[in-house]
Amino acid sequence: IISLTISISCSKRLDLEPAIGLSSIDVYKDADNYVNVLAKLYAGMSLSGLHGPSGNPDIAGIDEGFSQYIRVLWNLQDLPTDNAICRWNDVGIPEMCKMEWSADNSFVKAMYSRIYYQIPIANVFIKETSDESMTEKGFSNEEQEELRMYRAEARFLRALSYYHAMDLFGNVPFVDETSPIGVFLPEQIQRADLFSWIESELKAIENILLTASAAPYGRASQSACHALLAKMFLNAEVYTGTEKNQDCITYSQKIIDNGSFSLDDQYAHVFMADNHTSPEIIFPVVFDGQYTQTWGGTTFLICASIGSLMDASDYGMNNGWNGIRTTPTFV
C-alpha cells in the first residue's frame, strides 16, 4: 500500500502545469503569440532578465549588470586592445586589460553563457515554426507565411550568436533545432566548419528577410544579413585559413547598392539617444530608458566613460561611473 501511494504521488508530481502563466505548448498553439516569443529572442541581446535592470534573470548565479550580452561582448572585444582600458579593480577586469585572462575569467564565462542561452531558445522557436509543425497546428497560409519570416529572423539571431562563439572561442559545442531536448553533451564543431555552417545559414535566409526599407526598426533585414556575411568574410583567413576578401567586397557592395544606408554627416549622431534616425546603423540592438533598462548596453558604455572631472549632464546622464578610458596608443 505504501509503495502504491508513493507511486501515485510521484506520477502526479511529474505531470504538473505551470502555476503562473502559460506552458510552452499553450504559447505555440496560437500564431499570435509567436511575435512575442520573437521579441524575447531580440531582447536577449539587450536585457539580462525579465524585470528591467535586475530581477528574474535569464541566467542564474551571475550578476545581471556585468553579464549583459553587449557589455560582456564589448569587454572581450575592446579591453584587451589599444581601444580602451577600464580603471576598475572588479574581478576579471584587470586581467582583461592586461591580456592575462583565462577560462575562469568572469567575463569570459558570462559571454559564453549568454551565447549558449540565446542559441537554444532560438532553436526551439525555429523548430516550432517548421513547415511541418505549423501545418500540424492548423495555421492558415497567411499565418504560416508570416511565421516563416519570423523563423528567418530567429535563424539570423542564432547565426549571430554562433558568429560570436566562433570569433571568441573557436571550436565550440554545436546544437540546432534537430538536437535532442534535455541534458546531453553536444559534439564540438571545428571553427572552419562552423564558419561554413553560418555562411550557408545566412545565404539561405538572405532573400527571405525583409529589405532594409521594409523591416521594422530593430529587426534583422537583408542588409543585416549581408553585413554579418561581410564581417565574416573579412576575417575568413583567421577562421578557416582561406581568405575571402572578394566575397567581403561583394556583400559590402550589396549594402551600398541597397541605398538605405550611408555614413552619417555628423559622426557624433551615431552615438546619441536619437540615433534611430541615423542612416549609418544597419542592425541596432535597441535600448530605451523606459522599456529596456539594464546596467549593461549603452547605459554601461556611456556612464562608465564619464569621468570625475566631466559633467554627466553634458552627455544626457545623471552621473558617471569613472571607469572606461581610451589609451595613449589609440589617441
Map each language-model feature to its residues.
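An aromatic- and glycine-enriched ligand-binding surface/loop that stacks and positions planar moieties
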Residues: 11-91, 195, 203-204, 219-331
